[in-house]
């Protein structure tokens, strides 16, 4: 690991402390504001320098996509967009980690998934929520699952009958997704075990 300049150390310490206190990395704007930079672009340049020195990793496409590499990572990983054919928990899909005790969920949460859309709103799962997921393939009919259909990931209520799977929305405006197991690729990524709703985290 290369030696950090005093300014780079300030940025690194700010990121580490922000994660410790709020459970998530700061945005570029927050770094700029707290350290007196003229703009978020100045913060971005310092982040790039830290990334070149191997102490952080920048996750593209995420405003809080900063991962510390100097210390052992803790907390629950937030999974971002998943590329077709790749594992859900592949390192490159993890936007950041939230300092939440996995054991607060039963069974314990292995990862968080950002909810997109309102198909499950009738049971309180809203667009932008962070869905806590226990990674397992052992699920039963009627449970809320994270499923992958032909490389598309979705959150729905499971109903399996023979070679047919019905993935049911909890919103009357959304039709069920019907999967023919003889013709389509289908897998269970996990069981929904809770929801985190915080406008600051979305």
Curated annotation (Swiss-Prot):
Protein name: LexA repressor
Site residues by UniProt (Cleavage): 84-85
Function: Represses a number of genes involved in the response to DNA damage (SOS response), including recA and lexA. In the presence of single-stranded DNA, RecA interacts with LexA causing an autocatalytic cleavage which disrupts the DNA-binding part of LexA, leading to derepression of the SOS regulon and eventually DNA repair.
Family that this chain belongs to: Belongs to the peptidase S24 family.
One Gene Ontology term from the biological process aspect of the record: DNA replication
DNA-binding region: 28-48
Tagged with keyword Cell membrane: no
Keywords on record: Autocatalytic cleavage, DNA damage, DNA repair, DNA replication, DNA-binding, Hydrolase, Repressor, SOS response, Transcription, Transcription regulation
Top-level taxon in the UniProt lineage: Bacteria
Taxonomy of the source species: Bacteria, Pseudomonadati, Pseudomonadota, Gammaproteobacteria, Enterobacterales
Entry keyword Secreted: no
Top EC category: hydrolase
């Amino acid at each position: 690991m290369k030696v950090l300049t005093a300014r780079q150390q300030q940025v690194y310490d700010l990121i580490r402390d922000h994660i410790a206190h709020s459970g998530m990395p700061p945005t570029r704007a927050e770094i700029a504001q707290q350290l007196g930079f003229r703009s978020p672009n100045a913060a971005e340049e310092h982040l790039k320098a830290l990334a070149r020195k191997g102490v952080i990793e920048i996750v593209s496409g995420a405003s809080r996509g900063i991962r510390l590499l100097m210390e052992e990572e803790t907390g629950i990983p937030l999974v971002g967009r998943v590329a077709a054919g790749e594992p859900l928990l592949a390192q490159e899909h993890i936007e950041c980690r939230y300092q939440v005790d996995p054991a607060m969920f039963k069974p314990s949460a292995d990862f968080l998934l950002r909810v997109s859309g309102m198909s499950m709103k009738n049971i309180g799962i809203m667009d932008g929520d962070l869905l806590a997921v226990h990674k397992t393939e052992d699920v039963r009919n009627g449970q809320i699952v994270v499923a992958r259909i032909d490389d598309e990931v979705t959150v729905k209520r499971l109903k399996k009958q023979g070679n047919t799977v019905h993935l049911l929305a909890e919103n009357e405006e959304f039709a069920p997704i019907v999967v023919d197991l003889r013709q389509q690729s289908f897998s269970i990524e996990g069981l929904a075990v809770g929801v985190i709703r915080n406008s600051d985290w979305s």
